[in-house]
Amino acid sequence: MRSKGRARKLATNNECVYGNYPEIPLEEMPDADGVASTPSLNIQEPCSPATSSEAFTPKEGSPYKAPIYIPDDIPIPAEFELRESNMPGAGLGIWTKRKIEVGEKFGPYVGEQRSNLKDPSYGWEILDEFYNVKFCIDASQPDVGSWLKYIRFAGCYDQHNLVACQINDQIFYRVVADIAPGEELLLFMKSEDYPHETMAPDIHEERQYRCEDCDQLFESKAELADHQKFPCSTPHSAFSMVEEDFQQKLESENDLQEIHTIQECKECDQVFPDLQSLEKHMLSHTEEREYKCDQCPKAFNWKSNLIRHQMSHDSGKHYECENCAKVFTDPSNLQRHIRSQHVGARAHACPECGKTFATSSGLKQHKHIHSSVKPFICEVCHKSYTQFSNLCRHKRMHADCRTQIKCKDCGQMFSTTSSLNKHRRFCEGKNHFAAGGFFGQGISLPGTPAMDKTSMVNMSHANPGLADYFGANRHPAGLTFPTAPGFSFSFPGLFPSGLYHRPPLIPASSPVKGLSSTEQTNKSQSPLMTHPQILPATQDILKALSKHPSVGDNKPVELQPERSSEERPFEKISDQSESSDLDDVSTPSGSDLETTSGSDLESDIESDKEKFKENGKMFKDKVSPLQNLASINNKKEYSNHSIFSPSLEEQTAVSGAVNDSIKAIASIAEKYFGSTGLVGLQDKKVGALPYPSMFPLPFFPAFSQSMYPFPDRDLRSLPLKMEPQSPGEVKKLQKGSSESPFDLTTKRKDEKPLTPVPSKPPVTPATSQDQPLDLSMGSRSRASGTKLTEPRKNHVFGGKKGSNVESRPASDGSLQHARPTPFFMDPIYRVEKRKLTDPLEALKEKYLRPSPGFLFHPQMSAIENMAEKLESFSALKPEASELLQSVPSMFNFRAPPNALPENLLRKGKERYTCRYCGKIFPRSANLTRHLRTHTGEQPYRCKYCDRSFSISSNLQRHVRNIHNKEKPFKCHLCDRCFGQQTNLDRHLKKHENGNMSGTATSSPHSELESTGAILDDKEDAYFTEIRNFIGNSNHGSQSPRNVEERMNGSHFKDEKALVTSQNSDLLDDEEVEDEVLLDEEDEDNDITGKTGKEPVTSNLHEGNPEDDYEETSALEMSCKTSPVRYKEEEYKSGLSALDHIRHFTDSLKMRKMEDNQYSEAELSSFSTSHVPEELKQPLHRKSKSQAYAMMLSLSDKESLHSTSHSSSNVWHSMARAAAESSAIQSISHV
């Protein structure tokens, strides 16, 4: 059966006959779902038997069988009789002898259970709850079945009085009209398999007319009107299809006679003389009205039944309403149903799959899934996607699909340039020590012509051996020092290869190995090569670096001389080898985030070219003196136990003390004005390092970048290494803090301070990388580079640092030749190197930073970096100080790698590594969050739009910006509000470009907090100290003229050019809510944890540093250790004068910590009331620049070195000064 039918009680007089079947009252009869149902008389659609037969489609009035002989084993109840039926050709039928009332039930229908029916006239199909055929009840055999199988079907729909229904896999006949004695029992014409009321609520696509009394639906208004003619409780209300006047005329014979003459067909308007003729005609219309299945022979009177039947053929294409139990085969009907019946529901249904959406845009986006066009294709596996987000997810989850672009440093593969750039921020490589970072053009030593980028490219071709190994590193012509040191002693295992492969230091094709035997013989006989670039001991360090035995001990390295200036114009096209392409320029910082594009960087490079060509003219006439001095050096021999000859070791290092005077002046200025003034005063950082500058000032022009190749790796302890923060979190650090990078004293919430809080502000080393100059030009990527390093610095120099470092035991003889592991080549310590995150700084390192010779070689800087780490570790771990031994060499090595504490090395190795991409994380929580980028897990779901995120901060930002429409960041200049700090910063840069205000990158909450009185006091104290210092140092003689020129001219010119170049590329300040980009950035925040959200503390009022400075100013002026707490230790420790200079500048910088909480904008504004606020900072910057020029012009009049000294004497005097504690005299002695 095709219904969950309901049955009435059996007739009482049939109880003896059908005693085996218990009486089931209709009110208690459960339906197929087991729920008791109530009687309903609105029954329309009993169905014909055996409608599943494929060979037979029953037609009303068709003959089934001839009259048969009734066997004795099929008894008929006494109140019924078997005689010829009124239905034409139907044979015998059942007639009643008594009145049968509505609601009585007969049954069940008895027969054999079969899988199919032999004779469709004598059987029924039993259906399950999903309307699938379970089995058939077949009563076609003469001796099988009950008397119910002789009940015939009515010829037309108004003659029936019984309907069939299924109850628990049994068929019953129910009376739906009163049957008078002598009437035949007739089933509903073409009776459907289930009653109308059980079928209609599930499927009736076009029945949109509802009865308000019984909630029954009809296909047309006419049907509803017919239904409403009778009360809903009467049996004919559901089936009355006859006109009211027709039923009234049936009551009288006269009317019947009239009807016989005027019978009219309602379907085709034909008129018949009598009712019988009309009924015969109606049979033809009934046949035409059948709804036949186009996939099987079944036919139905109701379209809804046909639809339900067709669902069994294609079960995968029915669309269910999400708000009710109705099912539709056409999604348009489902959509119409939802709009009409369910107000406010998702009314937009997909025509392909039926999925509904609340908006048409959501449906349009969803339709792309069914589209055959998939434009987003994976480059590796060529799998295509209709949406870009799906392609990104695919690449995250499949590591193999990210291997397209190879990292030049570590060999790791990536699928996109942006992912490669992001990786390069964390990767060790040549771009951390790019050519300009060590031999920047325009930075010419005395006697060295300034070079543009083209000439440096020429040198790259001239020296392929070193160029292949160190990438873009070049050696400028005219330098009197080698690219590798003149080591007469060597470190056999000084530079292990590490985990990442590098090409051989001197490839087989290199001119080093390609020298002829004659050339080798000649060069081995001479201590020096013919070109002044090379010193004789170059071969030793090359052997130590490369560890290639093929380079013989007696084979010096030959580097081809610089090509003539005539060749340069023809090789300008080789600029691309200077990493001017997008990948090479941007990758050192991973600047794929916002503002810096390849064209931006190229424009910077081009502008730098023109600038350096002009600056280079002023040094060309200085070439010959230095070359002559270099030729004198070529005659010197070197011992195996000292770098320099004994005669040179006897000289005094006068130039070292003069360097100290310049450093002191820079420290005074830096203390008051941050690091904005003479940003790159090259010796500014030396005081914070364990050694002084190795070269006198005549070698160093004044540029805005530090001389040293390790400004990014400030002194900080190993246990505090962290991954770089994302720009988003960096901005949180900026908020409420000053623009000076030195007050970022945040520490992680879950970490305790490793040292006691000192009574005075910790001495924080200044970094030329982290300068406000960079901040004022950068985007989020630049800001991240500037703010990353500082939170860890103050942990390094705690209150106990001085005693721990200076009271080290005497050096052990076994450690005389230290062999430190270059940390930057060990992936465990790669975090310390991941700080070149600024494309601007990468360019400045390449093209603006001078790097004299081997001292600033990348690997040697790594050695010094190791020494800094060990000293820092000694300050934090007193028990480890005994391992830090001092070696009397120019490099001041501390300890061999095997002497490192085991817990120190284990600290890095216990990091957590991603098994998909190999990234290393300091904590398991960071690794867990990072793994979500590979697995696609997004546990944080938005409660408003069901969008999910892998990081909770992304969800919070999404809710704040998209749903809550919050804009908490307000510009204090124009009152414009923004949803993100980065957008506000970009907007503030636009103000700065228009000279509206100098609040480029500082947070708006940190602006304009200082008072004019404080600034005036600082101005007076600043110039007073400069005058006092210059007065003390005026006893010296004059310095070379070219230093003053470079100090006063080229520095400010270059800085201005850089600012102009970068400001021209700033983005528009329109707020971009690009959540995809922010998500990628926050994936990188996994490395740093929650450091971006930690509070910023200030050391402003700790220990009253101003009083301390006034008390110790006399000591500072004589280059002695300034803090009182260091005074006793310096005589006990026996450290060299290098440490004296370091502590001197440290004490100066301690004073600077007092001012760190004031941003640059605050410190650079006048207190005068008549100057507009917008003009204060530009005017004050100009005044500071003039003050610096005056200061340096006066200080440069001191005698730095006698002109008769050779450049080699300079080298030897410096080395002697670095090795012997008594070599450097105070400024008062100069």
Swiss-Prot record:
Keywords, comma-separated and alphabetical: Acetylation, Apoptosis, Chromosomal rearrangement, Cytoplasm, Developmental protein, Differentiation, Disease variant, DNA-binding, Isopeptide bond, Metal-binding, Methyltransferase, Nucleus, Phosphoprotein, Proto-oncogene, Repeat, Transcription, Transcription regulation, Transferase, Ubl conjugation, Zinc, Zinc-finger
Bias (Pro residues): 755-764
EC number: 2.1.1.367
A GO term, aspect molecular function: histone H3 methyltransferase activity
Basic and acidic residues compositional bias, start-end: 560-575, 606-618, 1042-1057
Segments of this protein annotated with the region Disordered: 510-530, 547-618, 718-821, 990-1009, 1030-1113
Entry PTM: Phosphorylated. May be acetylated by CREBBP and KAT2B.
Biased composition (Polar residues): 515-528, 586-600, 778-787, 994-1005, 1030-1041
Main location: nucleus
InterPro entries membership: PRDM3_PR-SET, SET_dom, SET_dom_sf, Zinc_finger, Znf_C2H2_sf, Znf_C2H2_type
Motif CTBP-binding motif 2 per record, residues: 772-776
Catalytic reaction list: L-lysyl(9)-[histone H3] + S-adenosyl-L-methionine = N(6)-methyl-L-lysyl(9)-[histone H3] + S-adenosyl-L-homocysteine + H(+)
Chain positions covered by the region annotation Interaction with MAPK9, SMAD3 and probably SUV39H1: 189-440
Record PTM Phosphoserine, positions in chain: S624, S726, S740, S1037, S1039
Major enzyme class: transferase
Segments forming domain SET: 78-190
Domain description: Both zinc finger regions are required for the transcriptional activation of PBX1.
Name of the protein described by the UniProt record: Histone-lysine N-methyltransferase MECOM
Phylogenetic placement of the source organism: Eukaryota, Metazoa, Chordata, Craniata, Vertebrata
